[in-house]
């Protein structure tokens, strides 16, 4: 399908250079970039890591799970989150 888009001269030159380096057409490079952009938007980027409490022990007493500030401080200080059996 043919369409017309407006892009900066600098971006077009960079895309043409990339196409030459890869031995691809300019259209293929633009299509690949657009596919990656749309796929990234669908997935929402990297998922944050969340602490996992093993064997159902739960968090250590005294850690307020409703406070972002407390959780951030505990994680920044590298303290143990799991309670011990």
Curated annotation (Swiss-Prot):
Sequence segments annotated as region (Disordered): 45-65
Any single GO BP term: regulation of DNA-templated transcription
Record's keyword terms, sorted: Toxin-antitoxin system
InterPro entries: CopG, Ribbon_hlx_hlx
Any one Pfam family match given in the protein's UniProt record, by short name: RHH_1
Isomerase found in the keyword field: no
Residues in the signal sequence: none
Protein function: Antitoxin component of a type II toxin-antitoxin (TA) system. Upon expression in M.smegmatis neutralizes the effect of cognate toxin VapC25.
Protein name stated in the entry: Antitoxin VapB25
Organism the protein comes from: Mycobacterium tuberculosis (strain ATCC 25618 / H37Rv)
